């Protein structure tokens, strides 16, 4: 594993070995064997974070390409029904950012720990509530939350039904959208979304970090 990582990253073998040890000690990798014959597999914890130009994602295959290349390999041991739900929710949210945000960059992330899987899709676009309010001629962005909750509104009628966010918000144990200074969490009264302590979205969306 160290040899492959060294070749792909350009880091020294010592640097790679240190990182592998840190990942194993932290639970992101699981060791097998001892000494120089050690092998590794995915640990109980999983993590991925990517920041890319929106146009670049579209040119490379869109949301399904990101899923197949980045998330699916980290979630191979999920139950098929759970993996299907995760796939739908992630690709729907990423598709929304790609097709509707008009932003330059998209931040995507996943963290799995203690049986709890969290995902993030964020962009630097105009904001979903602001866009809905403008498109529907609403005088207050808060009314956009009501339109969104109905699951029948889309700002791009050609090819979109408006059901993606509606369905995703109900298939997940927790779901929230933050935009234009507002927050939509359909389960906030009963089971509010857990904190995402593993990511700082605002810091991660800095343009200088785009790849």
Where are these regions (language model features)?
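Bergerat-fold GHKL ATPase/HATPase_c domain
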Residues: 1-91, 103, 133
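Conserved beta-strand-loop-beta-strand hairpin that lines the nucleotide-binding pocket
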Residues: 30, 35-52, 98-211
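Catalytic glutamate of the conserved HExxH
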Residues: 92, 97
């Amino acid at each position: 594993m160290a040899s492959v990582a060294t070749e792909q990253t350009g880091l020294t073998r010592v640097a790679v070995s240190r990182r592998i040890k840190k990942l194993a000690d932290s639970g992101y990798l699981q060791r097998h064997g001892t000494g120089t014959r050690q092998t590794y597999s995915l640990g109980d914890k999983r993590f991925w974070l990517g920041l890319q130009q929106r146009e670049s994602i579209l040119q490379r295959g869109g949301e399904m390409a990101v899923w197949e290349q980045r998330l699916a390999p980290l979630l191979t041991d999920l139950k098929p029904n759970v993996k299907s739900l995760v796939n739908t929710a992630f690709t729907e949210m990423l598709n929304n950012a790609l097709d509707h945000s008009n932003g330059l960059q998209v931040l995507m992330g996943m963290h799995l720990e203690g049986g709890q899987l969290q995902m993030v899709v964020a962009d630097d676009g105009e904001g979903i509530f602001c866009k809905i309010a403008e498109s529907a001629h609403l005088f207050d962005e808060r009314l956009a939350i009501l339109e969104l909750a109905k699951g029948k509104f889309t700002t791009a009628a050609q090819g979109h039904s408006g059901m993606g966010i509606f369905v995703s918000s109900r298939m997940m144990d927790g779901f929230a959208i933050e935009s234009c200074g507002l927050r939509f969490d359909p389960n906030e009264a009963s089971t509010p979304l857990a904190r995402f302590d593993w990511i700082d979205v605002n810091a991660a969306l800095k343009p200088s970090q785009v790849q």
